[in-house]
Amino acid sequence: MYPAHLLVLLAVCVSLLGASDMPPQPLNLVQFSNMIQCANHGRRPTSNYMDYGCYCGKGGSGTPVDALDRCCKIHDDCYGEAEKSQNCAPYWTWYTWKCGSDGPQCDDSETGCKRIVCDCDVEAADCFAGAPYNNANWNIDTKKRCQ
């Protein structure tokens, strides 16, 4: 083996070791992101919803700032109910769905926890698509506005 090949192999191994320390991303967030794009027909990037208002993104508290933020609170509550009543792990639950001309739809074969989580995501994605987006509510100071 050539010395250059050994260096490349070593670099790959070191980078893989570093990546093993990174926490895995919840699988469901990928599906939910795709579902949002289906519902809004690609009009707004999913990243715009990651740090919006008091509830869109990680965590949530206080009173939602507008209709879109209420969609996120409803979604958070839906996941919370799935965790409590069905013992689901919504962020890790993988389900089957399709993107139709009228928006996202859960596969009819899904039941139990998968169906509940899929329904939560469809409801939220449709809600996002129907709610106005206010740029002033993106990346707000949650300590001040979300009491």
Swiss-Prot record:
<dbReference type="GO" id="GO:0005543">
    <property type="term" value="F:phospholipid binding"/>
</dbReference>
<keyword id="KW-0964">Secreted</keyword>
<feature type="disulfide bond">
    <location>
        <begin position="54"/>
        <end position="146"/>
    </location>
</feature>
<feature type="binding site">
    <location>
        <position position="57"/>
    </location>
    <ligand>
        <name>Ca(2+)</name>
    </ligand>
</feature>
<feature type="disulfide bond">
    <location>
        <begin position="88"/>
        <end position="113"/>
    </location>
</feature>
<dbReference type="GO" id="GO:0050482">
    <property type="term" value="P:arachidonate secretion"/>
</dbReference>
<feature type="disulfide bond">
    <location>
        <begin position="38"/>
        <end position="99"/>
    </location>
</feature>
<keyword id="KW-1015">Disulfide bond</keyword>
<keyword id="KW-0106">Calcium</keyword>
<dbReference type="GO" id="GO:0006644">
    <property type="term" value="P:phospholipid metabolic process"/>
</dbReference>
<dbReference type="GO" id="GO:0090729">
    <property type="term" value="F:toxin activity"/>
</dbReference>
<keyword id="KW-0443">Lipid metabolism</keyword>
<feature type="propeptide">
    <location>
        <begin position="20"/>
        <end position="27"/>
    </location>
</feature>
<keyword id="KW-0479">Metal-binding</keyword>
<keyword id="KW-0800">Toxin</keyword>
<dbReference type="InterPro" id="IPR016090">
    <property type="entry name" value="PLipase_A2_dom"/>
</dbReference>
<keyword id="KW-0378">Hydrolase</keyword>
<dbReference type="GO" id="GO:0005509">
    <property type="term" value="F:calcium ion binding"/>
</dbReference>
<feature type="disulfide bond">
    <location>
        <begin position="78"/>
        <end position="120"/>
    </location>
</feature>
<keyword id="KW-1199">Hemostasis impairing toxin</keyword>
<feature type="disulfide bond">
    <location>
        <begin position="106"/>
        <end position="118"/>
    </location>
</feature>
<feature type="binding site">
    <location>
        <position position="76"/>
    </location>
    <ligand>
        <name>Ca(2+)</name>
    </ligand>
</feature>
<keyword id="KW-0732">Signal</keyword>
<keyword id="KW-1201">Platelet aggregation inhibiting toxin</keyword>
<dbReference type="GO" id="GO:0047498">
    <property type="term" value="F:calcium-dependent phospholipase A2 activity"/>
</dbReference>
<dbReference type="Pfam" id="PF00068">
    <property type="entry name" value="Phospholip_A2_1"/>
</dbReference>
<comment type="function">
    <text>Snake venom phospholipase A2 (PLA2) that inhibits collagen-induced platelet aggregation. PLA2 catalyzes the calcium-dependent hydrolysis of the 2-acyl groups in 3-sn-phosphoglycerides.</text>
</comment>
<dbReference type="InterPro" id="IPR033112">
    <property type="entry name" value="PLipase_A2_Asp_AS"/>
</dbReference>
<feature type="binding site">
    <location>
        <position position="59"/>
    </location>
    <ligand>
        <name>Ca(2+)</name>
    </ligand>
</feature>
<dbReference type="InterPro" id="IPR033113">
    <property type="entry name" value="PLipase_A2_His_AS"/>
</dbReference>
<feature type="signal peptide">
    <location>
        <begin position="1"/>
        <end position="19"/>
    </location>
</feature>
<dbReference type="GO" id="GO:0005576">
    <property type="term" value="C:extracellular region"/>
</dbReference>
<feature type="binding site">
    <location>
        <position position="55"/>
    </location>
    <ligand>
        <name>Ca(2+)</name>
    </ligand>
</feature>
<dbReference type="InterPro" id="IPR036444">
    <property type="entry name" value="PLipase_A2_dom_sf"/>
</dbReference>
<dbReference type="InterPro" id="IPR001211">
    <property type="entry name" value="PLipase_A2"/>
</dbReference>
<feature type="active site">
    <location>
        <position position="121"/>
    </location>
</feature>
<feature type="disulfide bond">
    <location>
        <begin position="71"/>
        <end position="127"/>
    </location>
</feature>
<dbReference type="GO" id="GO:0016042">
    <property type="term" value="P:lipid catabolic process"/>
</dbReference>
<feature type="active site">
    <location>
        <position position="75"/>
    </location>
</feature>
<feature type="disulfide bond">
    <location>
        <begin position="56"/>
        <end position="72"/>
    </location>
</feature>
<protein>
    <recommendedName>
        <fullName>Acidic phospholipase A2 S3-24</fullName>
        <ecNumber>3.1.1.4</ecNumber>
    </recommendedName>
</protein>
<keyword id="KW-0442">Lipid degradation</keyword>
